[in-house]
């Protein structure tokens, strides 16, 4: 998946799932890994990273 698609998926997931978007991407990454789909798992890892970057630093 190219960078533009990754960003589009991340934005859409963040818009639809809000604060749960990163967890959703992580879940899908794990599912792809378990299903023996390393390329798909890598796509979800990148989407998760993009979501994290969009959300910015966590404040505690």
Predicted stretch roles:
Residues 59-60:
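Acidic, Ser/Thr-rich low-complexity linear motifs
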Residues 14-56:
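Amphipathic, hydrophobic secondary-structure cores in small proteins
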Residues 1-20:
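N-terminal acidic leader/helix
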């Amino acid at each position: 998946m190219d960078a533009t698609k990754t960003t589009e998926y991340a934005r859409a997931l963040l818009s639809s799932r809000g604060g749960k978007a990163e967890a959703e991407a992580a879940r899908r990454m794990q599912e792809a890994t378990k299903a023996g789909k390393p390329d798909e798992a890598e796509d979800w890892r990148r989407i998760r990273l993009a979501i994290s970057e969009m959300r910015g630093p966590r404040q505690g």
